[in-house]
Curated annotation (Swiss-Prot):
The gene is luxS. It comes from the Bacteria. Binds 1 Fe cation per subunit. Fe cation binds at residues 57, 61, 124. InterPro entries: LuxS_sf, Metalloenz_LuxS/M16, S-ribosylhomocysteinase. Belongs to the LuxS family. The keyword Lyase applies. Homodimer. This is S-ribosylhomocysteine lyase. GO terms for molecular function: iron ion binding; S-ribosylhomocysteine lyase activity. Its cofactor is Fe cation. The keyword Iron applies. It catalyses: S-(5-deoxy-D-ribos-5-yl)-L-homocysteine = (S)-4,5-dihydroxypentane-2,3-dione + L-homocysteine.
């Protein structure tokens, strides 16, 4: 990495991080004082492992639907293109420990799920590409490593 790039994660040395972890990427303040907190929920070790798409896709649906049951501050949660984690954006919410609890409860919801929400051609752009069991396996692995979530390096 020779020059600073516009994208924060491109400035992160992916060879130094130790997944799984939950990292505050940054805080953006709007013109009216609202603050958006963006988190890197890294599930797999970069360049060593990744989530297979059907499980990741189902985990995305399950987390997007369920995390909002645990906080009104959620703006968005979505997968990284590298398939190693998710980004979570919250508005006016700066309690890191609460974020960890929110993620934990959401992953526990995934383990209890009996179906993937919005897993149909009307509500999803690739409805044939889902795996509830794959999502639950990823969630279980992440929960098993909860003690290390706040250790990035």
């Amino acid at each position: 990495m020779t020059k600073k790039m516009n994208v924060e994660s491109f400035n992160l040395d992916h060879t130094k991080v130790k997944a799984p972890y939950v990292r505050l990427v940054g805080v953006t303040e709007g013109a009216n004082g609202d603050k958006v907190h963006k988190y890197d929920i890294r599930i797999k070790q970069p360049n060593k492992a990744h989530m297979e798409m059907p499980g990741l896709h189902s985990l995305e649906h399950l987390m997007a639907e369920n995390i909002r049951n645990h906080s009104d501050a959620v703006l968005d949660i979505g997968p990284m293109g590298c398939q190693t984690g998710f980004y979570l954006s919250l508005i006016n919410h700066d309690d890191y420990d609460d974020v960890l609890t929110m993620i934990e409860k959401t992953l526990e919801d995934v383990l209890q799920a009996t179906e993937v929400p919005a897993c149909n051609e009307v509500q999803c752009g690739w409805a044939a590409n889902h795996s509830l069991l794959g999502a639950q396996e990823i969630a279980k692995e992440m929960l098993n490593e909860k003690a290390s979530w706040s250790e990035v390096f």
